[in-house]
Amino acid sequence: ARAAGKASGAREAGLPLGLQLLIYPGCAAHQDTPSHATFARGLVLEEPAISWFFGNYVQSRAEREDWRFAPLHAPDVDGVAPAWIGLAECDPLVDEGVDYADKLRLAGVPVDLEIYRGVTHEFIKMGRAIPEARKAHADAARALRLAFHLE
């Protein structure tokens, strides 16, 4: 969420960014999507942990509603950097990641959205164990090479 919020801040400051590289970002102010309900318990990122993170990151309801915390609620995302978004299919955050990708696309922002099937939040750290993590590493690296005109 911080990286996505900073992309809007960079746009406002006139600082061109090459890419938003977002790996299972939290983009919403509330845990009210179907994926939050479906994956609230039993996997890596559970609802109590998300509530704990929210409670330790934002001090007030106003801060929680602020689009810089929850970029899905930004008034506009026109002109922000293109985005590569990697999501885990079995993650409470998957729906808000898809929603953020849709918001960017509706604003004309180029988006490459990858949903890695059958994996959970934190899968990107498991490159030695699961092929989806290795694929995500390769996909993210390729997105960076393209953004920096190295390919």
Residues covered by each model-derived region:
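Alpha/beta-hydrolase superfamily serine-hydrolase fold, recognizing
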Residues: A1-E151
